[in-house]
Amino acid sequence: MIRLVGALLILLLLCGCGIGSMKRGNLDMDAALLQMAREMREETIGAFMNENCTDAAYLQEAYALSLDERDYALVHAIRSDIWQEAAIFHCNEENWSIIKEKAQVRCAQAKEQGIPSFLGTCGCYVYVLIGEDAQWMRTYLEGL
């Protein structure tokens, strides 16, 4: 099931990356992020997916951020034996430091619980990866 969620996330990332380039700050990436976020919210992955995880309330609770739906994409899957999370935030000059600070806090919380987590940036995007596949996802995103 972890592989299914990971494969879905990669598929969504690949679909979005065909539209533009994060490193070049291509304006089409805004459209790609919006599309990816919408698909993540609409996707049904069964019992593995926590249905309340992709809404603004979870974002506020986990990251202490209030963002418009077009400014983030978030997948969070939790079971008693598995915790996976991938969040991508679109940043601008006004909110860059705030989002990065909140993302660092989220990574630190996961590390305190012994869960692998990584924080990274790519162009005007900040990403947070938490869980077993975090290292693999980090390597993938750094290659974009």
Model-derived segments and spans:
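Post-signal peptide N-terminal segment of mature Sec-exported envelope proteins
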Residues: 25-45
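A short, solvent-exposed beta-edge/loop patch
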Residues: 111-144
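C-terminal motif of bacterial Sec signal peptides marking the signal peptidase cleavage site
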Residues: 13-16
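Positively charged n-region of N-terminal signal peptides that target proteins for export
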Residues: 1-4, 8
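Short, compositionally biased low-complexity segments enriched in polar/charged residues
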Residues: 46-84, 95-99, 116
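Short amphipathic alpha-helices in soluble, non-transmembrane regions
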Residues: 98-106, 138-144
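Second-shell loop/turn segments in exported
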Residues: 84-93, 125-130
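Bacterial signal peptide processing site
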Residues: 18-21
